[in-house]
Amino acid sequence: MESEDLTKTLEILKAISDLELAIAELYRCFSEFRAPEKEFWTALGEDEEKHARLVQKMIQMLLDRKFFCAPNGSFNESGVTHLKNFVERHQRKLQKLEIPSDFKSLLSIAWNVEYSLSEMNYTNLFSITEGELESLLLTITSETAVHRSKIGSKITVMRNSLPRSHHRGAPKGQPGAQRKVNSKAPLLKFT
C-alpha cells in the first residue's frame, strides 16, 4: 500500500476505533440509567470495547505491514464522524436528562446506532483483504448484526406486549365503516 493510502486508511481506522469506544461509553451510560437492563447494556458495551481493540489491532497490522490489502475509495468516512457526533450528542442529552431514559427510548437510539454501523459495512474499507485482517473485519460486522438482532428482538417484545384497543372502528373509506354525521353540513333533500 502506498504511503498516502496507508495514512488515509490509518486515519479512518482510528476514527472507527474512536466511534466504537464512544458507542461503548453510550451503552455504559444506558446501563447506569436502566438498572433492570444493566446486564444487557453492559454486555453490548463490552462488545463495542472489543471491537475497538480489534480495530486497533488492525492498525498495528497495517503499520507492521503483515498482510496485503488494497483500500477501497468508496468507503464513506464522513459517516463515521456523523455517527460519532450522534452518539456523543445523545449521551450528553441523556446525562442532562434532556431526553427520555425509558427502555424503549434507549432501544430506539441503540437501534439507530447499530443500523448505521451495519450500513457503513466496515468490509467496504478494502477492495482486497486477506487472512487475519479480513477475519477481524468479518468478526466486527457479524457481531454488529447480532447486536442489531438483539435490540430488534427487545423492541418486538415491547411492541407485542403493549395493550391494544379492542374497540377500533373500521378504517375510513372501507365498506361497512360507519360514518359520523356532520351536523354543520347541509342536508340533501330527495324529492
What name fits each language-model region?
Residues 1-191:
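Non-heme di-metal
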